[in-house]
């Protein structure tokens, strides 16, 4: 992933994680933040186990994953896809990344009148409920509304 994509997805964005069942029924969960590894290959999304239970079940069966990132104030959006994902516990660096993501998102949505407390209530995770969803994206798409929506973006 290039520096622009990384800066965007690790910034103040809304994150939606999606997958599907064996019957092709969609599953969706909100991500609370993300972190890209030093090699720019792997992405870890931070989620609530309870809220993402169906997504986790689908991913555990080997279903593909799509993650959409969108900045509320500008509607800039992009989507990353991978044929499968792995589940993990959050590492110490993940917690600081989660805090940075939530703080940046709070600054963005404050322009729409939402408080930092609102963001912490919606996106906050506790250690027992938190889970990491790891993916190695092989496709990226521009999803910002307009003439370039759906365009492929370079992943590597």
Question: For each of these PLM feature ranges, what is it?
Answer:
Residues 88-156:
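C-terminal edge-of-domain segments
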Residues 4-6, 56, 120-125:
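A generic local secondary-structure boundary/capping motif
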């Amino acid at each position: 992933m290039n520096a622009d994509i990384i800066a965007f997805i690790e910034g103040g964005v809304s994150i939606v994680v999606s997958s599907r069942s064996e019957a092709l029924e969609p599953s969706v969960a909100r991500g609370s933040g993300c972190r890209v590894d030093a090699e720019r290959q792997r992405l870890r999304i931070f989620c609530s186990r309870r809220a993402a239970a169906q997504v986790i079940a689908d991913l555990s069966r080997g279903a593909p994953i799509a993650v959409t990132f969108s900045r509320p104030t500008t509607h800039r959006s992009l989507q990353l896809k991978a044929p499968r994902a792995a589940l993990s516990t959050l590492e110490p660096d993940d917690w600081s990344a989660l805090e940075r993501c939530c703080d940046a998102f709070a600054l963005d949505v404050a322009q729409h009148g939402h408080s930092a407390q609102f963001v912490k209530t919606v996106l906050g995770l506790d250690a027992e409920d938190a889970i990491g969803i790891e993916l190695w994206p092989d496709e990226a798409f521009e999803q910002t509304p307009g003439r370039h929506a759906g365009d492929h973006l370079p992943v590597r």
